[in-house]
Amino acid sequence: MEAMTLFDSPPILITGMSGGGLTSAAKVLEDKGYYVAHNIPPKAIVDLLKLCASPESPVSKIAAVTDVRSRLFPGSLAETLDELEQLDMKPTLLFLDARDDVLIRRFDSVRRTHPLQDGETLKAGIQRERAAVQSIRERADIIIDTTNLSVHDLRRAIEASFGEMGHELQHVTLESFGFKHGSPRDADLVVDVRFLPNPYWVPELRGYRGTDEPVADYVLSQDAAEPFIDHFITMFDSMLAGYRHEGKNFITVGIGCTGGHHRSVAVTEEIARRLRERGDLDVSTLHRDIARD
């Protein structure tokens, strides 16, 4: 089928035992730029792949998650796989598994019932599911046993299984903010630049913002500014290497001053400029409080 050539990578179908790590696996693929459709009934998978493979679709990498709850819908996953093979649209089938005792512990830790428990014991539900998915497990292209894997280990296992995924650019968001409005809750790292002189106290600069040249020139011309930015980038490089090793490709850095209008904005823009020049990162900026009083 010619439409399949429009995908940058073969479609991935994620399935497996409930509690085996399907959600975590989906998150890894989302972080790697995949469009991930969750809890898709088997019969809908064919239409989904056809839609995303059409010339009008913006989707270049796709994965779909389907689990034992799909039994509520007509059609089986085995029938869907057969149909996809006939259409020359065979996805890579990723099956997530774990030992029964580990699955029991995971369900107990989140106080959830198993979808096939049906009023019986958790162990009975897991055994019923294992019997139901055995034939699909036998058809899997990749089986990952998550019994002894942490979330980071699972990420590395998926990246190893799908090769070049691990070589994508890291995404860095530099977010300026004002401490008086609170630090960004999603920041992985928070930097305080209130040690720099505040343009707010320079009457002719007060009405400008850090994106304006007069303020940027004032802030960046301070004796402490350039050494700080140099040292920050050196430190941040070592952090990026560690983040990559841990499979973390989306990093948010909060850069704060008092109000989020001047110093933090100017420093954020300068750091972003330097990082973009290198070409090894996908860098974006956000000035959270620049328009606030």
From Swiss-Prot:
Binding annotation for ATP: G16, M17, S18, G19, G20, G21, L22, T23
TM region(s), chain numbering: none
Originating species: Corynebacterium aurimucosum (strain ATCC 700975 / DSM 44827 / CIP 107346 / CN-1) (Corynebacterium nigricans)
Record: residues binding GTP: D67, V68, R69, S70
Database matches in InterPro entries: P-loop_NTPase (IPR027417), RapZ-like (IPR005337), RapZ-like_N (IPR053930), RapZ_C (IPR053931)
Protein name according to UniProt: Nucleotide-binding protein cauri_1197
UniProt entry keywords in alphabetical sequence: ATP-binding, GTP-binding, Nucleotide-binding
Keyword ATP-binding: yes
Purpose of the protein: Displays ATPase and GTPase activities.
An example molecular function term from Gene Ontology annotations: ATP binding
Entry-linked NCBIfam families: PRK05416.1
Family to which the UniProt record says this protein belongs: Belongs to the RapZ-like family.
Statement: the UniProt record of this protein carries the keyword ATP-binding: yes
